[in-house]
């Protein structure tokens, strides 16, 4: 399945626009990562634990969006947007949302 931020797919004709599809992931950030991130913030540097969590959440949101597109008969998602939000009383939760337009493009070998 082609997933792109572009509003079209070069060289492919969109045959049908299905609907907007979403993938949402909410994940908690654990205490040990918080301690490590705090030290890195103090001394400067990157928090690999947080970065890994962010990457995993983003990839899962995209997979979920793709699956929802497949479920309605689409073979591509265009105009993809990914949003991030910090939630919770202690800002201890991360929400990642992927959204796009599910479409059917002309026959392909993907």
Swiss-Prot record:
SUPFAM superfamilies referenced in this protein's UniProt entry, alphabetically: YbjQ-like (SSF117782)
Classification via Gene3D superfamilies: Hypothetical protein apc22750. Chain B
NCBIfam families reported for this sequence: PRK01119.1 (NF002224)
Similarity field: Belongs to the UPF0145 family.
Name by which UniProt lists this protein: UPF0145 protein lmo0208
